[in-house]
Amino acid sequence: MRVSPPSSLVRALLLGLPLVRGQATYGENYLSVSRDSEIVSRAFPELEDIELLSPAFTNPDTLPAGWRNGTEGPTSDTELDYFYRNLADRNDWLTYQAADFRSEEGRSIPYLFLSDADSTARNVTKLKVYIQAAIHGNEPAADQSVAALLGKLDRNQTFTAALLERLDIKILPRYNPDGVSYFQRALACNLDGNREHIKLARQQSRDIKQVFMDYNPHISIDMHEFTAPTIYGGNYQPGADALISGGINPNIHPDIRDLLLDGFIPFIGSNLVANGLRWEPYVTGTSNSTPGSLIKLESALEYARANFDIVLSTIESARADFISSNADIVVTDYYTRTNRTFTLVPVDFFETTPSVANLTRARPEAYLIPRTWFDVVAKLRNFGLEVQELDYEYRGTVEALNITSSVLEDVIYEGTVLNSVTTSSFEREVSLPSGSFLVSTRQKNAGLAFIALEPENIDSFVAFNIIPLERGDEYPIFRILS
């Protein structure tokens, strides 16, 4: 029997939460609820043909009291954990995996692993998919869509068997349980988990990154929900049901970017349209719904399954080509502005896929890091990079960078003051003691080293003052050229 959620619940999941109450406090940094007008609500009718088999929809009695006023999420940790454990108990293809670490406030962080034991036993080659949701605690459509996906897979075993014949799927259903508990965007420490991917300032971020890198997926999907009622130009409220983005970093292999932009994203978009939903490329300030998010998840998995050979061969060959490439790397870039129609109105749209490089540099064979900076090396290893610890004194010619300008921001951003630098390069002889480190760029995760270790990059260790520098300083990480 199909369970239809009450209309008030669906509207609630489409609520925008646009205004912060004030300066950050410890916990309870939820946002003010802004309900859509009746005119706007009528433009987002319920989708009667889509089953949402997550606890908030199948059992509305589990909704906490604070849900309607925007102070609590729709499903508690206890309720969601019970839901996933029950699914795992009755399905051999689903394994509940308790992480060996906890959130900042000590909440459990479970993973779910989906795999068909028979195809695994036959040593069938599979695509490895990673899905995470709710890195922002006040975006309920994210983890609700994951729960709805699991509910559908439990209900439709034929669909599940077809997927898992070619895919293994690891899911982090709730990245930020502390944020969900407080119904706030940030981690308990008030840093944004989605700005932690390179700087890795928090232990929870490092733990989750390690699991991701150890799994080593071919495809990763990050589920979000976007604020609905933001007004632009005085009276324009965006009307897209779903936003999709991927392949942004300019050092991503073009074949992988093309696979996303010409394959996955159009397929997902066509399925959204077929179900009566509107979609756009990602821009800030619009909405995302649980039905739309479920369709996106299903579509991504279905595209990967249906195009298994193309997807696998493209990713594997692109990885090999990236490792052996001698092309310059992109250090900084900018976005191109085009005028396009965005759900009925023309807007200036800054395209990020692809962006345009405005600073490139020869790809080094390796980065040479003095043993003094062992804490930097720990982060690099957390990225899945292989780092060699030298058991000999290193002597040789390297490319060094001198800081020619340094501009500090006048506000604190994500726990630090950002430092924008420029550099000039020169060659010099170095002598570094045994115990220093060498990071080869002939590995598939080298793109993360380019982001972190090229000082001009907006997310580099220099930008975030992990390596603090000022004008006239020599950058203490050296480049070994071909």
Describe the predicted segments one by one.
Residues 2-8, 19-482:
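Structured catalytic-domain cores with a bias toward divalent-metal coordination
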